[in-house]
């Protein structure tokens, strides 16, 4: 275990798909991290490697090289059983909540399954289910309903509740507002900020929307074609971007300068 200023960090992380001549490197030596209680925004265009970092952290993708550190402990060297125990400390909420919810399970069963994977007993965990539904501003009666009975914004809240039910230390939100309309998007963003403060969560927020990332993040890391090109406090990166790619991204947001003038 090594000392680190970060709660969660990746060091020289490389991820590649395939082998030999057909291998395709999607992350090249990326180093970034998030401090305890803060939110790191990961931005970049489609294919930049944002989601790959998240999936490598939770073990969906395997690191070809580099380290993934949680409280200074390298997760890449852990065995399956050890990693499973650590995995509950870091939860990922993805863009499509419907895909992450079993359509044959009630919401109560889905949350109970997160708490106890061997027995998804909604009655046994009724208090826990009601607590976390309430935390994301949903009524306890939602526990008896099925995923298709909810709107996209409500399903995203349910996915967040399910992730929080195991009481993680780090929450990774991967494009969770991209499919929502503006008003619902604002509700979810405000909810995340409230949860971060009330639960002392550390967060990684992934999005291609620079305005959204600016709203929720303390620091921002900019990715381009699998490489980290810039990182720093949100205000520094947005007001004085150093890398040409970052400047191009900011220039592509039509309302960015207008919002700055109105502020």
Region spans (language model):
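ABC ATPase NBD coupling module
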Residues: 20-22, 62, 75-91, 109, ...
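Conserved ABC transporter NBD signature motif
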Residues: 66-74
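Conserved ABC ATPase signature
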Residues: 146-150, 154
């Amino acid at each position: 275990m090594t000392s680190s200023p970060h709660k969660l960090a990746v060091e020289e992380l490389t991820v590649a798909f395939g082998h030999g001549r057909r291998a395709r490197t999607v992350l090249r030596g990326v180093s970034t991290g998030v401090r305890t209680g803060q939110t790191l925004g990961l931005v970049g265009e489609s294919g930049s490697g944002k989601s790959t970092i998240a999936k490598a952290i939770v073990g969906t993708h395997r690191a070809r090289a580099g380290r993934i550190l949680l409280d200074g402990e390298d997760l890449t060297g852990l065995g399956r059983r050890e990693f499973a125990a650590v995995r509950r400390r870091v939860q990922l909420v993805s863009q499509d909540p419907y895909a992450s919810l079993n359509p044959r399970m009630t919401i109560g069963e889905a949350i109970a399954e997160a708490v106890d994977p061997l027995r998804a007993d909604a009655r046994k965990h009724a208090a826990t289910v009601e607590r976390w539904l309430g935390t994301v501003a949903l009524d306890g009666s939602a526990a008896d309903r099925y995923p298709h009975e909810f709107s996209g914004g409500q399903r995203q809240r349910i996915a967040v509740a399910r992730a929080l039910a195991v009481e993680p230390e780090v929450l990774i939100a991967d494009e969770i507002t991209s499919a929502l309309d503006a008003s619902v998007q604002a509700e979810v963003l405000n909810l995340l900020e409230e949860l971060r403060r009330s639960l002392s969560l550390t967060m990684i927020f992934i999005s291609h929307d620079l305005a959204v990332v600016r709203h929720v993040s303390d620091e921002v890391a900019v990715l381009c074609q699998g490489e980290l090109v810039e990182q720093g406090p949100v205000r520094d990166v947005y007001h004085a971007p150093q890398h040409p790619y970052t400047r191009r991204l900011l220039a592509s947001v039509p309302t960015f300068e207008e919002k700055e003038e109105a502020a």
